[in-house]
Amino acid sequence: MVTSVAPRVESLSSSGIQSIPKEYIRPQEELTSIGNVFEEEKKDEGPQVPTIDLKDIESEDEVVRREIRERCREELKKAAMEWGVMHLVNHGISDDLINRVKVAGETFFNLPMEEKEKYANDQASGKIAGYGSKLANNASGQLEWEDYFFHLIFPEDKRDMTIWPKTPSDYVPATCEYSVKLRSLATKILSVLSLGLGLEEGRLEKEVGGMEELLLQKKINYYPKCPQPELALGVEAHTDVSALTFILHNMVPGLQLFYEGKWVTAKCVPNSIIMHIGDTIEILSNGKYKSILHRGLVNKEKVRISWAVFCEPPKEKIILKAHCQRRCLRLSHHSSHLAPFPNIFSTSSSGRPRRLYSPNEL
């Protein structure tokens, strides 16, 4: 198995190369499905990622709140069962805070390379937090067109502040504030998803660690311009092992979802947060909620940046199927976050192909 260190993709992109190294070229069977992401995003025909409006879900008016929660329950349930991904709008996190998070991340990646390298991780020794590029850890030595910055942002007592960027100065306060708001949003979503399964509101959150143990890990994905985007992927097809994944981006398209046997490009919805259902929730829901296979395309015109926050149970947490209503399948097996996830394609509960991916597998 190949475990060589990848070069910084940003350096390759800025070097003026016209052809990408062979390690970044996808297998022939994948190339036929990689199109121009800007043209793909313009398409209005065919299935579209659903949008869920959370406005007034916490209204002080009890009647309004009840009506909104019932609507959101049905819409979230439908989106989670059919897609496993959705755009959240009116989610309660201010545009100002989201902009601060984005500006801080963009500013960090605009620093000189020698400054970013001060925060470099050491994947070979198991130190995955920090600035890095994906290791070639499959048999072919294949690489993805991406650099990243990864670190745990919540709970507060588990943060390693020594690896948080000191520049820009707003990186720490913006990220800390965002983590608190996002943790609150996760509670709201898990509550509604629990109700959609016929469970009490707090059941799913309890199963993934509760307020005290659920981890929020942030990965800023930086996809430089690519001279041959038709041959490469920013991130290859995978599902997330998280419970939920929340994603911001810089309004450059690139996210694709594998839906009904085809790759669907997510549109750029202003002021939205993209949310994925992760493998953990698929397990807890006995496969009723779907962890969707997804990937990231690149382009030659614009840098794409996304901010993914993985909401994960602690590694020692045993994940069991939850009792979904009365006629749920009996608990028969479990998955533990202690067990390593293979870096290969496997089959999900719905029979579709997937490559299991964890933010700890970078």
Curated annotation (Swiss-Prot):
Needed co-factor(s): Fe cation; L-ascorbate
Binding site for Fe cation: H238, D240, H294
Pfam family, one: DIOX_N
Enzyme class: oxidoreductase
A GO BP annotation: anthocyanin-containing compound biosynthetic process
Family membership: Belongs to the iron/ascorbate-dependent oxidoreductase family.
Keyword Transmembrane helix: no
Protein name: Leucoanthocyanidin dioxygenase
Pathway linked to the protein: Pigment biosynthesis; anthocyanin biosynthesis
Cofactor note: Binds 1 Fe cation per subunit. Binds 1 ascorbate molecule per subunit.
Keywords: Dioxygenase, Flavonoid biosynthesis, Iron, Metal-binding, Oxidoreductase, Vitamin C
Reactions this protein catalyses: a (2R,3S,4S)-leucoanthocyanidin + 2-oxoglutarate + O2 = a 4-H-anthocyanidin with a 3-hydroxy group + succinate + CO2 + 2 H2O
Classification via PROSITE patterns: FE2OG_OXY
Induction field: By light.
Source organism phylogeny: Eukaryota, Viridiplantae, Streptophyta, Embryophyta, Tracheophyta
Fe2OG dioxygenase domain: residues covered: 211-313
Job description of the protein: Oxidation of leucoanthocyanidins into anthocyanidins.
InterPro entries: DIOX_N, IPNS-like_FE2OG_OXY, IPNS-like_sf, Oxoglu/Fe-dep_dioxygenase_dom, Plant_2OG-oxidoreductases
EC number: 1.14.20.4
Example of a GO MF term: metal ion binding
